[in-house]
Swiss-Prot record:
UniProt biased composition (Basic and acidic residues): 159-186
Organism: Pongo abelii (Sumatran orangutan)
A GO cellular component entry from the record: nuclear body
Entry protein name: Kinesin-like protein KIF2A
Molecular-function annotations in GO: ATP binding; microtubule binding; microtubule motor activity
Gene assigned in the entry: KIF2A
Lineage: Eukaryota, Metazoa, Chordata, Craniata, Vertebrata
Family annotation (InterPro entries): KIF2A-like_N, Kinesin-like_fam, Kinesin_motor_CS, Kinesin_motor_dom, Kinesin_motor_dom_sf, P-loop_NTPase
Chain positions covered by the region annotation Disordered: 66-186
């Protein structure tokens, strides 16, 4: 086989090649293939090295300057050309002769004339000469090469090459965008109105490097531990085609993809990032949540401490599931809740030698706080009174403590309490817990308190969304829930900062848990449960902001685990928008009262004279510790509590205090009425005697009637004032402004 003539082609030089899609670009020659007269070339495209095999004819057609030199000279086997051919060849070698034959003016540049003018005149002359001689094949080798490979082209300048590169990149980018649009069109779910948001969230998650919390991670010691738990989408949300807008990329980071819309109706995502001590995704079981949250607190109560663990979140976000146990339909498996898991570890700790010698006894209580009132769930929901003794210790009068010997006893008490807990229907849940349930495990040594573990399942944290136009009872539920949650937050903040005063009297919940917020050996854990659905996005953000206020964390871009290939943020197409991650997104401003802004705060705390002020004067309760703590609470949360909302809370607190006094006075009058009946019965029996003392009868009857009139008149006046307070509460509820948007 004859050896292929590669001309000026050498390994390592760059040649122009033509791709199958018509693109022309440079590539480096890597090998010369003599067996099939081809060359192998390679080039770099999108960071990848690509190559192909191209025949010599294609190479020479695009690179005529690489044509072999011997093809230009006449071959020895070729017979001498006729005269006409020789004349043509002579013209080719001496271009000026051609110009003089045509009698054209002498050109200034022979190359330009020869290439632009002489060449077109040669081929018709050659064609006519060949026809006259009767031979078409008698063509010079130079003309044969030109006919085969076309006229030689000039070398491209760097500017032209750069323009061609830009054009190539533009075409490539358009091709990629077209492929992306076609791919999106295939993925479009016409039945889902939020498929754009779904694609944005999916693409964003693809840029993250997931490092979720595992059981192998260490457990850190915290005096105040704040964690977040995400539940999976439920059946109702799945049927409604709701989207999961919560992402937990690492063990302490929670991201909320909040859908937004511009003025031009373009939809985009606003990503808000929060950091906590722990973050549990929707695959974490109750046992794992308990391991990092409540389990470290069990040892605290054996060391004469007070421990508190509470679940906080929107209705239906999984609070009762976390604290009470797994649900199977309407049935609850109490053995898998934090209540039972904590009790199990308590009994295991009792068997340890260093605690066994203490001879500790375990007791349990279970009560609920509903609309500011306390009810014993283990004693047929008996209403209880919360009082302070002379040592300023809070006592829940009448609360039953039941001794428990094993975990089974605890499970029975939990079943009894859950069966009679107050619930109601809200927009988020058909069976919603509307009360705070408090389950306490108490250790006593020889009758004296040794330690207490309070496990609280809080009511839903909806800020009046379901109570704006409801009846009084539901309205009071929402008011008490919101007030108690604000008070709980401030009490925990005071515990973490060792503040001298804790506003625990602002609500019944914090008043009952007072001993858990005071003392150096007090520890608290908060489990914020969140719903993943897009429909619950606002309530989810409220929950996360509340948790962030309890224990303020900072967040930086380095805390977000982006994958290595994506850099600090993913590549975004023009239809995507993501906010930069900055600490200002999630750092919630600490609310303190600025002394220089007292004029701004004064209208919130002082109101024009109204019926409440008149009632304060009459009842003498205007400066009670409860109302002082309520004022302090509202001052510390002035951005969340508007003047109208404070007036409403003030009216509700006043009404609740008056209600308790009216009921207490009514009970006292009833007991006194029994004594009056006995006295009146004795007087009537005296009149049946023949010679009874009429003066004594009249005197005693008059005394009884005067006493009755005085007591009943006082009770009637209080009832009238109580009715006025009810009207004042109703008027205040109508003046509450909608919740102001939070500026981050």
């Amino acid at each position: 086989m004859a050896t292929a003539n590669f001309g000026k082609i050498q390994i390592g030089i760059y040649v122009e090649i033509k791709r199958s899609d018509g693109r022309i670009h440079q590539a480096m020659v890597t090998s010369l293939n003599e067996d099939n007269e081809s060359v192998t070339v390679e080039w770099i495209e999108n960071g990848d090295t690509k190559g192909k095999e191209i025949d010599l004819e294609s190479i020479f057609s695009l690179n005529p300057d690489l044509v072999p030199d011997e093809e230009i000279e006449p071959s020895p086997e070729t017979p001498p050309p006729p005269a006409s051919s020789a004349k043509v060849n002579k013209i080719v070698k001496n271009r000026r002769t051609v110009a003089s034959i045509k009698n054209d003016p002498p050109p200034r540049d022979n190359r330009v004339v020869g290439s632009a003018r002489a060449r077109p005149s040669q081929f018709p002359e050659q064609s006519s000469s060949a026809q006259q001689n009767g031979s078409v094949s008698d063509i010079s080798p130079v003309q044969a090469a030109k006919k085969e490979f076309g006229p030689p082209s000039r070398r491209k300048s760097n500017c032209v090459k750069e323009v061609e590169k830009l054009q190539e990149k533009r075409e490539k980018r358009r091709l990629q965008q077209q492929e992306l649009r076609e791919k999106r069109a295939q993925d479009v779910d016409a039945t889902n109105p939020n498929y754009e948001i779904m694609c944005m969230i999916r693409d964003f998650r693809g840029s993250l490097d997931y490092r979720p919390l595992t059981t192998a991670d260490p457990i850190d010691e915290h005096r105040i531990c704040v964690c977040v738990r995400k539940r999976p989408l439920n059946k109702k949300e799945t049927q409604m085609k709701d989207l999961d807008v919560i992402t937990i990329p690492s063990k302490d980071v929670v991201m909320v993809h909040e859908p937004k819309q511009k003025v031009d109706l373009t939809r985009y995502l606003e990503n808000q990032t929060f950091r906590f001590d722990y973050a549990f995704d929707d695959s974490a079981p109750n046992e794992m949540v308990y391991r990092f949250t409540a389990r470290p607190l069990v040892e605290t109560i054996f060391e004469r401490g007070m421990a508190t663990c509470f679940a906080y979140g929107q209705t239906g976000s999984g609070k009762t599931h976390t604290m009470g146990g797994d649900f199977s339909g309407k049935n609850q498996d109490c053995s898998k809740g934090i209540y039972a898991l904590a009790a199990r570890d308590v009994f295991l700790m009792l068997k340890k030698p260093n605690y066994k010698k203490l001879e500790l006894q375990v007791y349990a209580t279970f009560f609920e706080i509903y609309s500011g009132k306390v009810f014993d769930l283990l004693n047929r929901k008996t209403k209880l009174r919360v009082l302070e003794d002379g040592k300023q210790q809070v006592q829940v009068v009448g609360l039953q403590e039941r001794e428990v010997k094993c975990v089974e006893d605890v499970l029975k008490l939990i079943d009894i309490g859950n069966s009679c807990r107050t619930s109601g229907q809200t927009s988020a849940n058909a069976h919603s817990s509307r009360s705070h349930a408090v389950f306490q495990i108490i250790l006593r040594r020889k009758g004296k308190l040794h330690g207490k573990f309070s496990l609280i399942d809080l009511a839903g944290n909806e800020r009046g969304a379901d109570t704006s136009s409801a009846d009084r009872q539901t309205r009071l539920e929402g008011a008490e829930i919101n007030k108690s949650l604000l008070a709980l937050k401030e009490c925990i903040r005071a515990l973490g900062r060792n503040k001298p005063h804790t506003p625990f009297r602002a609500s019944k919940l914090t008043q009952v848990l007072r001993d858990s917020f005071i003392g150096e050996n007090s520890r608290t854990c908060m489990i914020a449960t969140i719903s993943p659905g897009m429909a619950s996005c606002e309530n989810t953000l409220n929950t996360l902001r509340y948790a962030n206020r309890v224990k303020e964390f900072g967040i930086s871009p380095s805390d977000i685990p982006f994958s290595q290939g994506s850099g600090s943020r993913p590549d975004l197409s023009p239809s995507y928008e993501y906010d930069d991650f900055s600490p200002s997104v999630t750092r919630v401003k600490e609310l303190t009262v600025d002394p220089t802004a007292a004029g701004d705060v004064r209208p919130i705390m002082h109101h024009p004279p109204n019926q409440i002020d008149d009632l304060e004067t009459q009842w003498g309760v205007g400066s009670s510790p409860q109302r002082d703590d309520l004022k302090l609470l509202c001052e510390q949360n002035e951005e969340e509590v508007s003047p109208q909302l404070f007036t409403f809370h003030e009216a509700v607190s006043q009404m609740v205090e008056m209600e308790e006094q009216v009921v207490e006075d009514h009970r006292a009058v009833f007991q006194e009425s029994i004594r009056w009946l006995e006295d009146e019965k004795a007087l009537l029996e005296m009149t049946e005697e023949v010679d009874y003392d009429v003066d004594s009868y009249a005197t005693q009857l008059e005394a009884i009637l005067e006493q009755k009139i005085d007591i009943l008149t006082e009770l009637r006046d209080k009832v009238k004032s109580f009715r006025a307070a009810l009207q004042e509460e109703e008027q205040a509820s109508k003046q509450i402004n909608p919740k102001r948007p939070r500026a981050l």
